[in-house]
Structures are given as structure tokens and as C-alpha cells.
């Protein structure tokens, strides 16, 4: 049974996050998805980010709405970019263009430790109406909504 890792801050849970999470469950099939959620301590953002507790609650609510049984996933706190993927056995890691370099680093470290590399599943950005990627930063600036629709200027 595949063991799949995906991680992020998951602020606003926008359509880009949804695509990553959906891909993780698709790849896992009958296996399990481990979602690393960035801890408050690890955050280094230029905009305010809600607490780990709030982001975790929203993430769990989103997955529940997807209809995924609780035994098919686990949400863990990420205190560093690699999380448990260095030491634990995983088969796949789901990444965006932003997190792809972290997956390469994880595989380099795993190989040095004699562990098999993770299969990297690359998921392209979801574009907003203006052709620029949806991001939590853009949402917090009021440029777009969670679905990439441009906000009307007042």
C-alpha cells in the first residue's frame, strides 16, 4: 500500500492546495496520505498566517468534505521542511513548483542514508484568471479569491 507525503502551510486552502491534496489521495489509492502542516514556529511569510490550530482544523474539515475515511490520512506538524520524509519510509512525495527543490533535497539526504528515493509527483500551479499562479500571498493581498477569480477594485 503506497505511503504518500504532501506538505504545506495550507493558508486559505485555495484551489492549488486542493489539487495537491487530491493528487496525493489519487496516488495513494488504497494506501495512506501523510500531510505535513507547517508549524507556527517554522513560518516565514510576508503576510499574516493563521495559527496551526486553525489551519489544521480547516484542513481536516476540507478532507472530511472530500469523503476520505480517517484511516486513509494523517496530519502531522512540520517543524522543518523535510518532516518525517528523511527517516520514515514513504513511496511518493507530492510537490508544487515551489516545493520541488525540497523534494530533491529530501531524496539526496535519503540516498546518503541508504534509503530509497521518493518518487516525486510534480503538480503544476493552478492559474488564476490572469494567468498568474494562485497563492496565499495573492489572496492575502486581496488580488484574487481562493479560486483565482480576480477581485474587483473598489
From Swiss-Prot:
Class of enzymatic activity (EC top level): transferase
Record localization: Cytoplasm
InterPro entries: Cyt_trans-like, PPAT_arch, Rossmann-like_a/b/a_fold
Major location category of this protein: cytoplasm
GO cellular component: cytoplasm
Any one Gene Ontology BP term: coenzyme A biosynthetic process
Reactions performed catalytically: (R)-4'-phosphopantetheine + ATP + H(+) = 3'-dephospho-CoA + diphosphate
UniProt pathway: Cofactor biosynthesis; coenzyme A biosynthesis
Keywords: ATP-binding, Coenzyme A biosynthesis, Cytoplasm, Nucleotide-binding, Nucleotidyltransferase, Transferase
EC number(s) given by UniProt: 2.7.7.3
Domain of life from the UniProt record: Archaea
One example GO MF annotation: pantetheine-phosphate adenylyltransferase activity
Function (record text): Reversibly transfers an adenylyl group from ATP to 4'-phosphopantetheine, yielding dephospho-CoA (dPCoA) and pyrophosphate.
UniProt similarity note: Belongs to the eukaryotic CoaD family.
NCBIfam families tied to this protein: cyt_tran_rel, PRK00777.1
Protein name: Phosphopantetheine adenylyltransferase
Taxonomic path: Archaea, Methanobacteriati, Methanobacteriota, Stenosarchaea group, Methanomicrobia
Amino acid at each position: 500500500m503506497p505511503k504518500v507525503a504532501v506538505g504545506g502551510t495550507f493558508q486559505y486552502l485555495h484551489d492549488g492546495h486542493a489539487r495537491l491534496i487530491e493528487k496525493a489521495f489519487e496516488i495513494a489509492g488504497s494506501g495512506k496520505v501523510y500531510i505535513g502542516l507547517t508549524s507556527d514556529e517554522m513560518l516565514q511569510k510576508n503576510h499574516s498566517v493563521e495559527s496551526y490550530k486553525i489551519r489544521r482544523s480547516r484542513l481536516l474539515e476540507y478532507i472530511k468534505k472530500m469523503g476520505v475515511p480517517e484511516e486513509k490520512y494523517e496530519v502531522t506538524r512540520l517543524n522543518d521542511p523535510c518532516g518525517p520524509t528523511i527517516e520514515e519510509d514513504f513511496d511518493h512525495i507530492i510537490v508544487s513548483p515551489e516545493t520541488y527543490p525540497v523534494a530533491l533535497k529530501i531524496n539526496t539526504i535519503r540516498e546518503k542514508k541508504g534509503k530509497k528515493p521518493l518518487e516525486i509527483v510534480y503538480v503544476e500551479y493552478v492559474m488564476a484568471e490572469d494567468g498568474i499562479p494562485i497563492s496565499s500571498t495573492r489572496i492575502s493581498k486581496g488580488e484574487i479569491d481562493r479560486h483565482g477569480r480576480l477581485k474587483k477594485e473598489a
